[in-house]
Structure formats: structure tokens, C-alpha cells
Amino acid sequence: MIGILGGMGTQAGLDFCNKLAILNRGKIDQEYPLFILFNKSNIPGRPESIGVQTKNLSDKSKNKKVKKKYHSVLKSLLQGCKVLKESKCKFIVIPCNTAHYWYEDLKKKINLPIVNMPKEVFNHTKKKCKKNSSIGLLATEGTLKTGIYNKFFDRDYNLIFPNNSLQKNSVNKAIKLVKMGKVREANKIIKPAIEFLVNKKCKKIILGCTELPIAIFAFKSFQKIKTSKIFLDPNLILANSAMKRYLKK
């Protein structure tokens, strides 16, 4: 059984479940995959809980706050993983890119496999793109700051991000609008950031926040870009990986 730790955000978790079901359509109910979605929407905000500790003694109080926020999110993620483990799930997926900042500590504390979303996206990209290609990344500021994609991609690819203005006024706003249920508005807002990466000759664009595929694929916008298969949807890639692992059990 697949364990899905969702709620980051809720629509992203539901989007993952939908993709999981579509990937393995059954003719009857019994042919669909067994999975449990724990929509743990009370996990503290991930971008707000990311900070960089410094060695400056005057920043001790700041470092304590950073550490406290980090462990607050870790504790909540761990609680969710434990619920899925107790529900007899064989492995866990987390359809939230930023949450993978806590991946290594989670893995140490829970005796159950957790599929690493950024790693799966990297493995998928290796099959599609030559080394040293330019790869665009649309994501939260938290994901960009922590380098969870850089960790895998910097060895072989040139990751390109939107500039600060586009990050703030296009990407961040689009993500927020999806969380608010305003998908049509998000679809319009994200357009300048996509055009920026296309003009930078990116071979692929990673939709590195699970709200972004919802914004982009909900309507008929970007039809020409979509047909070029430039977008990499981490939720879909993760769902594919989960199904392969599930079918091996």
C-alpha cells in the first residue's frame, strides 16, 4: 500500500492521487492501486521555516529561532509518516517539493522507505536531456534557497531560475492563488515566468512546486509550449515512480 503524506497543499495532494489513479486505470475497482492519503494540512509553513544559520555570536537568538522552526516542521512531518507506517503502508511519498528539505532527517527517524521527489525528477531528466543542457526551475523561494534540486542537477545541468521580480510577482503569486482556489488567475500570473525560461532556451522546465501543474494544465493556455513537452511535472514523475515501486511489492 502506498502512503501519501499530503496537505502541502491540499490540492497538490489530491492532484497526486488523481495522477496515481489515471496511471493505472483499472477496469474494475479492485484493479486500482491501494493507497492512503493523509491530508496533514496542519504542518507549519515550509518556506517560513527555512533559514540559514550563521556563526556570528550576535545571531545566536536568530539561529535558535531557525532551529526551532525547522524542528517544528520535522516533528509534524514525522507524525504524519508514523500514521502512514501504522496504517501498514510499504513506502511513503510526499507530494511537496519544499518538504524534501527535511528528507534526510525524516529518513533517519522513520524505518520506512520515502521516495525522494527531486531525485526522481533528476533521474527522469537524465533520460530526456543531454548533459550541460539548460533546465528551468519554477519553485517556491524555500525550494530555491535550500538547493534541493541543485544537489542533483548542478553536476550535469545548468539550472536557470526566474529573476527576483518574476519570482515575486509571477511564481510566488501563482502558487498562492492555487492554494486559495483561484486557479484561473494563477494561470495568467505564471505566464511571464514561463516565457522568461523559454526565452533562455531551457530544454525542460521543472514545475518545482506541486501547485504549479494545477495552474498550468487546468486550462488551454500555453498550448504550443505544452505540445513541445517542455514541462516536467514532479507530481506525475513521483506518481510514476510510486506505481513502479507498488507493482514490485
Where are these regions (language model features)?
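Non-catalytic structural scaffold of enzyme domains
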Residues: M1-K249
